[in-house]
UniProtKB/Swiss-Prot annotation:
Binding site for NADPH: S13, W14, R34, K108, A141, R256, E282
Gene: gpsA
Positions annotated as active site in the UniProt record: K192 (proton acceptor)
Binding, sn-glycerol 3-phosphate: K108, G137, S139, K192, D245, S255, R256, N257
GO MF annotation: an example: glycerol-3-phosphate dehydrogenase [NAD(P)+] activity
Protein name in the entry: Glycerol-3-phosphate dehydrogenase [NAD(P)+]
GO cellular component, one term: cytosol
């Protein structure tokens, strides 16, 4: 008897790449997207023609715009939609929920209007005891789609769920580590995007490798302070979903957040930079949440504050750098 299919909900680059990986692991995968024309084009071309045109789908991957068809009989729901669409997606899933299914999300960010972590949104929409997990780590869609080696972390507080999800993803080219620090895994994955914008701004200004290394290191200190105040574990933030994702996103131009920063550092406007990227840039939204969480928890996050000022207060990139460098001296730790 064949295994139940996996429903991957969100057919952007990351959702498509994860769907391809799961199909290569031998799973039947239904990749859902809301645009019928786009999904029909994927089915005809056997690839995601918009985001990953050079990565043909493996056997077992079925694109569809029919949500009922995607969810029917599925054992796992993998949600890979932008954070602002996360709650709406869960509301569509709620009528199908039962204890035999597992909800996994690979979305990075917080809910913008409420400031809630995504696990809090899951609890509100699906119930506090619904089996769920978050998967995150240093990973670019193009590399996962090509089957290049990748390591991720899956976190759940539901007994046995992290192990079950890890078994689905673990393979020759993907290693999956286990955690029960759901908050810590989300925190690193969300706020590193803001720091990647900062690193991009620095490089766009031509400030070089020294400045980039300083931003990554002091950015990690901001993540650690926020994690301490929020209740995350420090070792989580030193792992794949924290430091690993931070280094990757700050140093490689595959990162949309870094590319946004590069454009801003070179003097482009926010609107023009976002239009040129053409996909969701989670760090631009999360910058607001960083400032809000820092104020709520009484945490000093100067780099994130300066990114917010460049994005939304009208500060120039060079003004932001001056304010960071002009801060009072203090101990490193």
């Amino acid at each position: 008897m064949s295994q139940p299919p996996v429903a991957v909900l969100g057919a952007g680059s990351w959702g498509t790449a994860l769907a391809m990986h799961l199909a290569r692991q031998g799973h039947r995968v239904r990749l859902w997207g809301r645009d019928p024309e786009a999904m029909a084009a994927m089915a005809e071309a056997n690839c995601n023609t918009r985001y990953l045109p050079d990565a043909p789908f493996p056997p077992g991957l079925e694109p569809t715009a029919d949500l009922d068809a995607a969810l029917r009989e599925s054992s796992c729901w993998l949600v890979v939609v932008p954070s602002q669409a996360f709650r709406e997606m869960l509301q569509k899933l709620a009528p199908y929920r039962d204890d035999a299914r597992v909800l996994v999300w690979a979305t990075k960010g917080l809910e913008e209007h409420s400031g809630q972590w995504l696990h809090q949104v899951v609890a509100e929409e699906m119930g506090v005891n619904f089996p769920c997990a978050v998967i995150s780590g240093p990973s670019f869609a193009k590399e996962v789609a090509r089957g290049l080696p990748t390591a991720l972390t899956v976190a759940s507080t539901t007994p046995g769920v992290a192990e079950r999800v890890a078994e689905w993803f673990h393979g020759e080219r993907m290693r999956v580590y286990l955690s029960d620090d759901v908050l810590g895994v989300q925190l690193g994955g969300a706020f590193k995007n803001v720091l990647a914008i900062a690193a991009g701004i620095s490089d766009g200004l031509g400030f070089g490798a020294n400045a980039r290394a300083a931003l990554i290191t002091r950015g990690l200190a901001e993540l650690m302070r926020l994690g301490d105040a929020a209740g995350a574990r420090r070792e989580t933030l030193m792992g794949l979903s924290g430091l690993g994702d931070l280094v990757l996103t700050c140093t490689d131009d595959q990162s949309r957040n870094r590319r946004l920063g590069l454009a801003l550092g070179r003097g482009e406007s926010l609107d023009a930079a976002l239009a040129a990227i053409g996909q969701a840039v989670e760090g631009a939204r999360t910058a607001r949440m960083a400032v809000s969480k820092a104020a709520e928890l009484g945490v000093d996050m100067p780099i994130c504050h300066q990114v917010h000022r460049v994005l939304y207060v009208g500060h120039s990139a060079i003004e932001a750098v001056g304010e960071l460098l002009g801060r009072d001296q203090k101990p490193e730790f």
